[in-house]
A protein has these predicted regions:
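Anion-binding and metal-coordination hotspots
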Residues: 1-284
Length: 284
């Protein structure tokens, strides 16, 4: 009995693979995900695929279908697909906050791409002045000429250890600093949540990357690229889902699903091309 169960579990793990922790019984390539359209309203997980498209001049330039639930993990495969198709990487890959991660920023640096993907806290960093300038955030702690980081109360923070970040491809490490003495601190209630000396995590490289992203996206060019992305990328999905009523994949298996999405994308591009040619003819 145990041997039979063990074989069953081994087979399930083999189907699931290393990159995910679930699969559908009716389609082994599909992964259970939370989708935006929750008809039952009970936060139910449903078998799905993560469809990614790259849009340029209103045309779908590249398509990819993934089993990853997170958009962050889909960015690099999509860029590699773009390179395979066109022989170069896009100079300005603009994306929303779901794509900004250390792995993706390093990938951009290695392949000559500028960092124009928002990170998770981008909106809060750029719109919430109180949060951005909070003196009790570790990134705002001043560093003296002696290289020692100090809190608003003037206490020193010393490096305790470094820790590798789980699931990181490029050896990202976080530094853990601890305050020398928090006892009797007048800012204790504002600064920390425990009775122990405060410990903060710092990744200066990632913080610098976030600052670079903010500068890029807050520039005039960045604002135009962001606006263009929201119109073209979101607009493309809107047209396909709402105007064409393509809201559900009908094929099973990742290869068949990719073929289906390719066909839908070709149809979208032909429709766009026809409309543009029609406008040119009308204007002439």
């Amino acid at each position: 009995e145990y041997a039979v169960k063990l074989e069953e579990y081994v087979e399930k793990i083999k189907i699931c693979g290393k990159e995910r922790n679930s699969y559908s019984k009716t389609d082994h390539s599909a992964t259970f995900m939370r989708i935006k359209t929750d008809y039952m309203g009970n936060d139910q997980l449903l078998p799905a695929y993560n469809v990614q498209v790259g849009v340029a001049d209103e045309y779908i330039a590249v398509v990819d279908v993934n089993q990853y639930r997170s958009d962050m993990d889909c960015f690099i495969p999509l860029m590699n697909e773009f390179y395979t198709t066109y022989g170069f990487y896009p100079k300005y890959p603009v994306a929303d906050a779901g794509y900004g991660s250390y792995n993706n920023y390093i990938f951009c640096e290695q392949h000559g791409m500028e960092k124009y993907m928002k990170f998770t806290m981008f909106k809060k960093e750029t719109t919430d002045r109180k949060y951005r300038e909070d003196p009790f955030r570790a990134v705002n702690f001043p560093i003296g000429e002696d290289g020692i980081m100090r809190c608003p109360n003037g206490k020193n923070f010393y490096l305790r250890y470094r820790k590798n970040v789980k699931g990181n491809k490029y050896g990202r490490q976080e530094e853990y600093y601890q305050c020398e003495d928090c006892s009797g601190c007048p800012y204790a209630e504002q600064c920390k949540k425990t009775d122990k000396n405060r410990i903060v995590r710092i990744n200066r490289e990632l913080t610098a990357m976030h600052q670079e992203v903010i500068e890029n996206l807050e520039s005039i060019q960045g604002a135009l690229l962001r606006m263009n992305r929201s119109i073209q990328a979101e607009g493309t999905f809107g047209i396909i889902k709402n105007d064409r009523w393509y809201k559900r994949i009908v094929r099973r298996g990742i290869k068949s699903v990719l073929l289906e999405v390719f066909l839908v994308s070709i149809g979208h591009n032909l429709y766009k091309y026809h409309n543009k040619q029609k406008k040119v003819a009308t204007a002439a």
